Design a protein with these regions (language model features):
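Bacterial N-terminal signal peptides
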Residues: 12-20
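Eukaryotic scaffold repeat domains enriched in small/polar residues
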Residues: 25-363
Length: 363
């Protein structure tokens, strides 16, 4: 996968990196959120040419203007207007789905209709520890719940429709769909489980051919990102991001344990853009690092929380190209918005940070 854009960014920014790196459903009726005017925050900062801009943050129902009745109808009413401890993210059809183990469910922000709701179903659909989620194009919801030892399934209106489980040790920590397959990370058995999307039947294990000491062995596979060509997996137990082809061949790894440039302390969520740039959030550094498809560090953004744009125990990152219209108003007028980078923070005042990949407006 050729990545000329990533290489260009790397040349421009690598000097800057070395100089600064060390340093469920119940809802509410709310007044329309007030837009906070803050100075534009760019990455890298001036005098370097910026490639990212911090746009805004979301921490609760005050970001949108009205409440849906869906959650009250389905779940009864426990009013929770603020996110507690958000983790996983999925963004589909103008709706941002946020796994929040702190409420035992999800927050759903419908930007198209300015609605905020808490999704905390009961009975067979009750969640214990919703960690990550995936929402398909039909708005069917898949929740990786290690507390239940299952991936829990819901239809587009929030009805519980089933589960994916394993007869062996099963602790699903992330879930993704690519084509007709459901991919699930399972740290308990050092591999991924792959299922048929339509039948929900088990197909195969991914990574089982490797043993301890092998480069491709997964000590604690926690998060994943699937592209047309490759699969990236966060191996939390080996402090690396591991790269495989779709057939399961190990290709390379990114990073190692340490506090230096391009290393990791607590690597968590990962995401890829269309040019092959890999985003990795690190709960230890409290930032996100960007790598090209050769594993070379390009830049980082965020940092321990001091103000807007910073992070506080970040957990997940997603890249989105389809919902730009809701955030263009935050972009500095000198720049165009290419796509969104969304990061969840488990602590601090800014729970969900929205960043934009930007490029200068051509005169």
């Amino acid at each position: 996968m050729k990545n000329t854009r990533g290489s260009t960014i790397g040349v421009i920014l690598i000097i800057s990196i070395f100089s600064v790196f060390a340093t469920s459903c119940a809802s509410f009726l709310h007044k329309k959120a007030k837009t906070k005017k803050i100075a534009s925050v760019f990455y890298p900062p001036s005098p370097d040419t910026p490639h990212l801009q911090y746009l805004t943050s979301i921490s609760g129902s005050d970001f949108v203007g009205k409440r849906t009745k869906f959650g009250t109808f389905i779940l009864g009413a426990e009013d929770v207007s603020q996110m507690v401890k958000p983790y996983g993210l999925s963004f589909t059809n103008g709706k941002l789905y946020i796994c929040d183990p702190g409420i035992g469910g999800l927050e759903i922000i419908d930007l198209k209709n300015n609605e905020y709701s808490n999704f905390t179903p009961g009975s067979n659909g009750q969640m214990k520890s919703p960690l990550n989620c995936y929402v398909d194009k039909n708005e069917f919801l898949y929740v990786a719940d290690p507390g239940r030892h299952e991936v829990v399934l819901y239809d587009s209106v929030g009805n519980y429709i089933g589960k994916i489980a394993d007869t062996g040790s099963f602790k699903p920590t992330d879930v993704a769909i690519y084509g007709d397959e459901i991919w699930v990370t399972n740290p308990d058995n050092h591999r991924l489980n792959v299922y048929d999307k339509h039948t929900k039947q088990f197909i195969r294990y991914f990574g089982e051919e490797f043993g301890p000491g092998d480069d491709g062995f997964l000590y604690s596979p926690y998060n994943l990102c699937i592209t047309a060509d490759v699969i990236y997996i966060t191996d939390f137990g080996d402090f690396k991001i591991k790269k495989y082809d779709r057939a399961g061949k190990f290709l390379s790894s990114i990073g190692s344990y340490g506090t230096g440039v391009g290393q990791f302390v607590r690597p968590k969520g990962i995401a890829c853009d269309k040019d092959g740039i890999l985003y990795v959030v690190d709960a230890g550094f409290e930032n996100a690092q960007m790598f090209n498809d050769k594993g070379q560090l390009l830049m980082f953004f965020g940092g321990p929380y001091k103000g807007p744009g910073d992070m506080w125990l970040p957990a997940k990152v997603v890249v989105d190209y389809d919902n730009l219209e809701y955030f263009k108003k935050y972009v500095d007028p000198k720049y165009n918005l290419n796509y969104l980078i969304i990061v969840s923070n488990q602590y601090g005042p800014d729970k969900i940070n929205i960043y934009g990949s930007i490029s200068p407006v051509k005169n």
